[in-house]
């Protein structure tokens, strides 16, 4: 017995109709029962309670996605950690009486020496684009202050690029450096806690910029390094060390930190009397 599905245009029900053809005279219509009203009510209420789909981000006529202005007003995650957790802990630990005494990260200076590529316009432009993608800010060219014959450098020649980060861009770069850049470094065991300069400033050297996800990996390509100098308002290295530790800087545990006390180098004019040489 063969069963065929037939759609009846005159049928008021929108449900499919099945007919069993036993003979040309006897035709029996088998109608599927409609779903109960309770199921329809539950489906309608679920659709009403579902959260609305987020609207697509606005785009300009050229196709560029426009960012909501309120996004720029939000506090960065690392900045919120500093305000809510770091400031109370350091204030209690060092006994500060004023909020302005609490050390903070003032700026970050990223420097990249180019060497022989500084004289190549394509290499210089490529290095500037890479550093701009990493830091989020376009760098400037650094030029030699004096001529050095052994390095074939003349005064005024471009020898590298540098960028100074402050504010939200600074916290964004520091967050990615701590959580993405340093952990992806090969054979990384932590940064040296003795890399302070005695005035609360910390310097990190990276041999490869490819540890940042913004730089694509190229087999056989030249690897450019970079120097990262974190400038803080701390008066001593212990305060700066504690500040960066609370921010998440992975210091090496097998290296003992020591307070660096550097004396000012006395030059020849320091030993000369003030009245000497005057007539």
Curated annotation (Swiss-Prot):
GO terms for biological process: translation. HAMAP family: Ribosomal_uL5_B. Binds 5S rRNA, forms part of the central protuberance of the 50S subunit. It comes from Oryza sativa subsp. japonica. Residues 1-43 form a transit peptide. Keywords: Chloroplast, Plastid, Ribonucleoprotein, Ribosomal protein, RNA-binding, rRNA-binding, Transit peptide. Residues 51-60 have a biased composition (Pro residues). Residues 1-23, 40-63 are annotated as: Disordered. This is Large ribosomal subunit protein uL5c. It comes from the Eukaryota. It is found in: Plastid, Chloroplast. The keyword Plastid applies. Part of the 50S ribosomal subunit; contacts the 5S rRNA. GO terms for cellular component: chloroplast; ribonucleoprotein complex; ribosome. Pfam families: Ribosomal_L5, Ribosomal_L5_C. Its main location: plastid. The lineage of its organism: Eukaryota, Viridiplantae, Streptophyta, Embryophyta, Tracheophyta. Residues 41-50 have a biased composition (Low complexity). Belongs to the universal ribosomal protein uL5 family. InterPro entries: Ribosomal_uL5, Ribosomal_uL5_bac-type, Ribosomal_uL5_C, Ribosomal_uL5_CS, Ribosomal_uL5_dom_sf, Ribosomal_uL5_N.
């Amino acid at each position: 017995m063969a069963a065929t599905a037939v759609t009846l245009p005159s049928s008021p029900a929108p449900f499919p109709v099945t007919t069993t053809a036993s003979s040309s005279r006897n035709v029996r219509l088998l109608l599927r029962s409609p779903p109960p009203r309770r199921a329809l009510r539950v489906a309608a209420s679920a659709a009403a309670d579902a959260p609305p789909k987020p609207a697509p981000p606005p785009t300009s006529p050229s196709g560029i996605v426009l960012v909501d202005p309120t996004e720029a007003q939000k506090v960065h995650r690392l900045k919120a950690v500093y305000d809510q957790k770091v400031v109370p802990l350091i204030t209690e630990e060092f006994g500060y009486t004023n909020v302005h005494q609490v050390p903070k990260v003032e700026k970050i200076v990223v420097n990249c020496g180019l060497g022989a590529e500084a004289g190549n316009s394509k290499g210089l432009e490529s290095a500037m684009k890479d550093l701009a993608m990493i830091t989020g800010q376009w760098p400037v060219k650094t030029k030699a202050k004096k001529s050095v014959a052994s390095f074939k450098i003349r005064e005024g020649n471009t020898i590298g690029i540098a960028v100074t980060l402050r504010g939200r861009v600074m916290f964004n770069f520091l967050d990615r450096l701590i959580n993405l850049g340093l952990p992806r470094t090969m054979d990384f065991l932590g940064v040296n806690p003795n890399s302070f300069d005695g005035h609360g400033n910390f310097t990190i050297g990276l041999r490869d910029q490819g540890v940042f996800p913004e730089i694509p990996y190229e087999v056989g390509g030249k690897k450019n390094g970079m120097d990262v100098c974190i400038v803080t308002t701390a008066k001593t290295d212990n305060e700066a060390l504690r500040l960066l530790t609370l921010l998440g800087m992975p210091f090496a545990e097998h290296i003992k930190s020591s307070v660096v006390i550097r004396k000012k180098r006395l030059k020849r004019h320091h030993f000369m009397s003030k009245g000497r040489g005057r007539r």
